[in-house]
Every structure is written in C-alpha cells, then in structure tokens.
C-alpha cells in the first residue's frame, strides 16, 4: 500500500522524534519474541490450570507452535454500547481456530458510563476508571499464556485504559 506523501513524511518525523524513548519498548518486544511463547515456560501445573476449561483447544494449547490469543472484554449487560461484545469471544475463537490457533477470554474489565452516573454518588469513579481498567487488563494477561491479545471496548475512558495495558502486554 502506498502512503500519501504527507502521511509518509509525518510518520517518518514521528519515528525519528520518538526513537530514543521507543527503543526500550522495541527491545522489550524483541526479547519477548526471541524468548518464544510465554506459556512454554509455565510449570506443568500452571499449564494445566490455564488449559483445563479449553475443551477442544487443550491439545492445541499444549503445543507452542499454535498461537494463543488472549481476549480482554468490557462486555456487560447494562451498557448498550458494550452489548455487542457478548458474542465476540465465540466469533474470535472460531476465526482463530480456523487459522490454526487458539483464543481464550483472559478476563473482563470494569466498564462504566459517566452518562449514567452523572449526578449520582460515585460519579467521580470515572475519573480514575482508566487506571483501574488498565490494571484489570494487565491482571487478566499476567498469566503468561498468551502470544497476543485483542481488547474489546468502547468509550473515552475504557479504550485509553485498554491501550495502556496493551503497551505492556
């Protein structure tokens, strides 16, 4: 794909400007890639716990040649914007399975809407919900069983929290 020349120039400037601060991140990602799938380094009991509820994917998970995708979701029944995420994990599992990999829901993160809580006691929780969401997503992915992750979320508080977590996992 050919980039528009302005976008190409801006991208090059951003890469050059952020080179020093981005280097530690790139080094960390390269070290993780060179180390191989994290789940290969788990203890037998750790792997047993991680795969126990995986049904037909257990055998595939036990091999480190098949990628395992972690799914972090903000699905809940109360907020209409999140409701479509109810079916996404099954759809993602099917697509990943068809491609030869596995996918597991790593965890759910809290999701709130300040439009619902405005004027209510507790509405100030939205001010630090990004940090809580980032921490919750990090906890969900801390089991070292995933080769990649997909984050299902919407909203100006939730997506930044998920992006913060994505920078570490």
What are these regions (language model features)?
Residues 1-169:
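Metallocofactor- and cofactor-centric catalytic cores in central/energy metabolism, strongly enriched
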